[in-house]
Amino acid sequence: MIGKAHLGPIPQTDTRAGYIAQQPAIDRAISRVLEGGSYILGREVESFEAAFADFVGVAHAIGCASGTDAIELALRACKIGSGDLVFTVSHTAVATVAAIERVGATAVLIDVEPGTYTMAPHELSRALQVPRTGRPAAVLPVHLYGQPAELSTLCDLARANGLRLIEDCAQSHGALYRGRPTGSFGDIGCFSFYPTKNLGALGDGGMVVASSLALAGALREMREYGWRERYVSACVGINSRLDSIQAAILEVKLGSLAADNARRSAIADRYDSGLAALPLTLPKRRADATHVFHQYVIRLAQRDALRDWLHAAGIGTGIHYPVPVHLQPAYRGRLAAGPSGLGVTERAARQILSLPIYPQLSEDMIDRIITEIRGFFSRFR
């Protein structure tokens, strides 16, 4: 520790700072909703849905209660359930796999690429050639840390095998793959608005996006008990509605998302430059994609020691994620994997560390973080 803890803590993420940055506009939006008296769905949600659909470049956006529900609704709308296989990754938030199991389907876990930590297309290709009990139904890649997965190859594999492609975009708001937004490639894109996301609510929220009118209609029904008309269920659905206050807040914040993502990218550039000479692995950026740096993740063998060092200096870090889904107690020993196993995933979980990154991170804060990391290596080299 260089001795700068007295300067005040630097959190790994700071949702309050994001609110303060837009407080007048957010407060006005909240007041408008409160005074209007409509708090579930309604005009505010419809307005945000239209704005978000335009942002992603799709015809339809349907608000829901969370990113987890977004994946569940997507699977249900695609008629995926018991006896079906969904190919996804273990290096993800558990919500990805939990949603698959909530519809009764079975997750088949594919290893990730060592540089991007997104689904490895060659591993998916091998897994699709292995005979299995159950019907292969969908590929569900995760655009992790703000980095798009290798969508061209994944889309080709899904199409060639007659599978749905459902994108987990919980961490990739505004990320581009070959110039197109994530969420616009698959049958359905699934977004989370958890407060720490690049586009975060002041509570929970989610969104499913689709270009198919039929899928959009099914999603709208299923998010509200399967209602086609009030109190009459045309299909089995769930209760997963985006509330009006969160929609109003999110529409305000959507207006600054491009600038916020640009700031995240600038912070990542500073880290890249300041840490380049050190014996650690920096994030890899796809040449044909735009990374929006939901997380800035470094990798090193001394991960835990560096984390302790930064904590002592008042600098917060995270591990995304410390235990792969297939090794967590609730799932250990009962999830299938691709033929090569999950070695890349398991090694990454032991070595990755997420540094502070959010739009309000100041240049002085960035300097301090870089200085502390350099100090760690000077001390222990």
Per-range role (PLM):
Residues M1-S38, R43, A313, P356:
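N-terminal "arm"/small-domain region of PLP-dependent enzymes with the aminotransferase-like
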Residues G37-L85, H91, A99-V103, L109-D111, ...:
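Phosphate-binding glycine-rich loop
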Residues G115-A201, V209, S354:
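Active-site phosphate-binding strand-loop segment of PLP-dependent enzymes
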